Structure formats: C-alpha cells, structure tokens
Regions:
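Catalytic loop of short-chain dehydrogenase/reductase
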Residues: 100-101, 132-215
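Short alpha-helical oligomerization interface
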Residues: 97-110
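Rossmann-fold scaffold of SDR-type NAD(P)-dependent oxidoreductases
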Residues: 9, 84-94, 132-138, 221-222
Length: 284
C-alpha cells in the first residue's frame, strides 16, 4: 500500500498543532504529514519539532491570504508525490477583539470565503481516490444565524461556488457603506463569514460530484471542531463562548481526525458540516 500523504494548512497553534500527532499515529511512520506556517522558517521549525516528537512531518510555507498559495502548495505535492490523501484547511482570518466590522470584513471574507474556494479548487485535482478534503469551519456557519430573508442567498442546492462568494462580496460592500444592519446582517462579522465558508464548501462539493470531478470514494466536508480554548478564541471566552464549554485543542483535533480518517468505501457524510461525527444540518 502506498504511503499516505496528508497536509494540514495552518498547523502552528491550537487545533492545527494538535492534529499532526493524531494523524501520524493513525497513518504510520511511512506516511508524510505536511504542516504549514506563514513563513518557510516557521514551517521548517514546526516540522523539526514534530519530527522530534515522532511525527513524520515536513514543513511548507503557506498563507491563506495569499491568492497564489493554494495552487503553489498543491503543485509541490503533485510533483513530489503525485497526489494527496488528506487535506485539512485549518487556517483562517479570525475576528479581532476591539476591531470594527468595517475594518475586519474585507480581509476576513477575502481569506475565509475566497481563500477556502481557492483551496478546494487547487487540491481537488490532486486528491487521490478515497481522499478527504476538509475545511475547518464552525456552527456559526449554519443558516439559523442569519435572518430568514437572507438565507435564500445561500441556496447551496443550486448556487455555484462563485455565486456564494459574490453574496459575500455584497456583504462586505454593505458593511463598508454602512447599510449592513439595515439589510439584516448580524453585527458580528464572524457569523456571515462562517456562513459563507460553509456555503461555498457545500456548493463546491455538489459541483464536484455533478461535474464528475470527484475521485472515486473521495469526501469533501466542512468540520466544526466545537468551542475550543486557543489563542484565537481566548478574547471571546465569557462573551461569545462559555469557558465551561471549551475543549482543549487536542480534544477538538480528535473530531477532525475522525472525519479525515473515515475508512475507504465510506459514502457519507458528504458536503456537510460535521462536528465530532454528527452532521449539523445547514438549513436547520
């Protein structure tokens, strides 16, 4: 059996840092687990740390905010290995405490919505049969977090991925022009951002299957790790999140690994948002 190739996009901290050890233990010493950081030096440092911990890791630089990064990294994996078995997109632009939506909306949507679609488009062509392509998102991305009149804009049974991102661009324009509240968008930018991220993943998964672009047995899903205490969420504990509900990064990573390691021949879940093995219905 060929050695498994996995990549974790965004692996320096929190859940991303906890994932390599879990995947390494499951995939064995012959596997290659790529971990990314924003700079080459940080990626190599991370890979060295993981290697000392017994993880078969290699480092690559990757920044989700760089439009060229997904295609560049996918090209490297194609050249070195011919394909990839597991892709976990864990990187994201996180809301910043004390920063207004007008400042955060454009970079957040550019990264989380458009960046997610670039990852999906770049890595699907090199995904091996029975491969797993996972976008780490959140239950904040469920339609229940939007008012009813906005939900039809995210009809992932019909809309193309680019159409979803056009909706997100219109949201950014509304925020910057000061009309977002009147249009009914939530005050906190993370809700629309995550809805867009989950919706574009669902729309892309539907397209991939309908277009015959999906490798045999491959699965594309979004994943909700659940509330997790990390550097990115610490400022929101006690306000947005309940500290008593928070997991450790290691606990959250187990749920993501479970989705990534579903055995060959598994047909579902597909095109869903999954939290610790349970499908969270997008429209509920």
């Amino acid at each position: 059996m060929d050695a498994k190739i996995a990549i974790i996009l965004g692996a320096t901290r929190g859940i991303g840092r906890a994932l390599p050890a879990i995947l390494g233990a499951a995939l064995g010493s012959e596997a290659v687990i790529y971990v990314t950081a924003r700079t080459d030096a940080d990626a190599e440092r991370l890979a060295t740390e993981l290697t000392h911990e017994g993880v078969p890791a290699r480092g690559l630089p990757f920044d989700l905010a760089d439009p060229a990064a997904p295609a560049r990294v996918a090209s490297i994996l194609r050249e070195r290995h011919g394909g990839v078995d597991i892709v976990i997109q864990n990187g994201a632009y996180m809301p910043r405490s004390g920063i207004s939506a007008a400042e955060d909306a454009r970079p957040m949507i550019a990264t989380n919505s458009h960046g997610t679609l670039r990852v999906l488009r770049s890595f699907l062509p090199i995904l091996r049969p029975d491969g797993r392509l996972i976008i780490v998102a959140s239950s904040m991305g469920l339609l229940r977090n939007l008012p009813e009149h906005l939900r039809a804009r995210f009809d992932t049974t019909q809309a193309a991925p680019d159409a979803i991102n056009s909706v997100m661009d219109s949201y950014v324009s509304a925020v910057e022009s000061g009309t977002a509240a009147a249009e009914g968008w939530p005050d906190w930018v993370n809700y629309p951002s995550k809805v867009g991220q989950v919706a574009v993943t669902r729309a892309f998964a539907r397209w991939a299957k309908q277009a015959g672009a999906l490798p045999a047995g491959a699965l594309i899903n979004a994943a909700c790790p659940g509330v997790t205490l990390t550097d990115a969420t610490r400022d929101f504990m006690g306000t947005v999140f309940k500290p008593e509900d928070a997991q450790t990064p290691e606990q959250a990573a187990l749920g993501l690994a479970q989705l990534a390691l579903l055995p060959a021949g598994t047909a579902e879940p597909y095109g869903e948002l999954v939290r610790h093995g349970k499908v969270l219905r997008f429209g509920d």
